[in-house]
Amino acid sequence: AFAGVLADADIKAALAGCAAADSFNYKTFFKSPEEVKKFFAIIDQDHSGFIEEEELKLFLQTFSAGARALSDAETKIGVDEFATMVKX
């Protein structure tokens, strides 16, 4: 799903950069608002306009088998909330 969007080196750097809770630096990872929307669309597999909990779990497991568990109690986020979360 990330072919043409992320290079292998970028994926490895992102995984290394977010190994600990609250350590992912989104300000340097996403290069533009369009890129944020691309990532959202990839994760939102049912195209509902929201990333539900199961979609996020599936994405994290696909992205990295060793991905840490989410600590947020919310069960879905919309594209605007996702963009705000990764930009702010």
From Swiss-Prot:
PROSITE patterns named in the record: EF_HAND_1, EF_HAND_2
One Gene Ontology CC term in the entry: cytoplasm
TM segment ranges: none
SUPFAM superfamilies documented for this protein: EF-hand
Keyword Calcium: yes
N-acetylalanine carried by residues: A1
Residues holding Ca(2+) 1: D44, D46, S48, F50, E52, E55
Keyword field contains Metal-binding: yes
Residue positions binding Ca(2+) 2: E81
Cross-referenced SMART domains: EFh (SM00054)
One of the record's GO molecular function terms: calcium ion binding
Domain EF-hand: 31-66
Gene3D superfamilies in the cross-refs: EF-hand
Other facts: Is regarded as an important allergen. On the 2D-gel the determined pI of this protein is: 4.23, its MW is: 11.35 kDa.
Function: In muscle, parvalbumin is thought to be involved in relaxation after contraction. It binds two calcium ions.
Family of this protein: Belongs to the parvalbumin family.
PANTHER family linked: PARVALBUMIN, PARVALBUMIN ALPHA
The protein's name in its UniProt record: Parvalbumin beta 3
Organism per entry: Merluccius productus
